[in-house]
Structure formats: structure tokens, C-alpha cells
Amino acid sequence: MNESMVTPYPLVDITPRVALVDKIRYPMAGMLSHQVSVGIYNPDTQKTVYLNTGDPTNRYFTNISWAPDGKSLYLIELNREQNHAKLCRYDSKTGELMSTLMEETHTKYVEPQHPILFLPWDHTLFIYQSQRDGYNHLYLYNTDGKLIRQLTRGECWCKRFWGSTPRRGK
């Protein structure tokens, strides 16, 4: 991550008896932000393949997860305003974008906090967590980006996914 263009910001640490000031790079609204690239390092070849994500400015990459077969990498690309998120799949050997599986937008912000979780018995299905209806819920998708069904619902928060067992015929 290249933060050299981000203005240093003083952060005051009040935990010691005499406060200390530490300058951190903090991307203030309306000012330049850091530039991020995502690389995959192969210890066998000792080479790094960088994902071809396009322009590295004004975007965040979060919730990175591997496909169970290791052939692709999934991540969420989030714009700087944090109101538009895209779940993307990249080829782990070439770094090329394979597909954009889904997009989420909101007038205020989207808050992706969890990587996708593949079902251990069916690697074409994964669980995605979203607050799209105002509450954090679980959604079942396939690797083509098709919503299969909403798994949890209601005026409550799904705070953690503990696991599941396969149902016969499903």
C-alpha cells in the first residue's frame, strides 16, 4: 500500500501519564487517499501476481477469501464513499477479473464486514452477509452470482455464523 500521498494527521495517545503525539496517515474527506494493490505470492515460484483491479485510487479492497480449489480469489471492492460494493472473483494465476458476482449500493453506506463462506459439501454455493435490509442477515449465493435464497430474516442481527450441516437433497 502506498500512503505517501496521504497527509499525516496527529493522533494523541492519552493512555500514558504524559500524552504522546503520533502522526498517522489518515485520508481526510476531500484529500488524497492511499493506493492499494492486492498481490498473491507463490512460495514455490517465489513470484507475486497482482490482481488487475484497474485504477488503484479511491477504492478499498476487503473481505478477501479463497475459492476452495485455490484457483480464484474473491474480494469486495468498495468505493471511497463506501456506498457501492462489488463482490469480484479474480483468477489466482493471472490476476485477471473473472466476474463481478454482485453489487450492493446504499444512499448512505454499505458495510461489508465478512468474507464469503463456501459450503463444505458444495463449493458452488457460498454464504454472504449483508445489512441490505437494515439488519445483518445471511444470504445463499452460487458462484455465478445468483441469489438462491435469504437464509435469515427479521428485525434482528445475525452476529455470527457458527456452521451448518447439509440437508438431504438440498
Q: Positions of the model-derived regions?
A:
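Conserved beta-propeller blade repeats
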Residues: D22-S37, G54-L78, H84-S92, L97-Q129, ...
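Short alpha-helical
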Residues: Q82, D133, K146
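Predominantly five- to eight-bladed beta-propeller fold
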Residues: M1-Y50
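A structural motif specific to WD40 beta-propellers
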Residues: V49, M98-S99, I148-R149
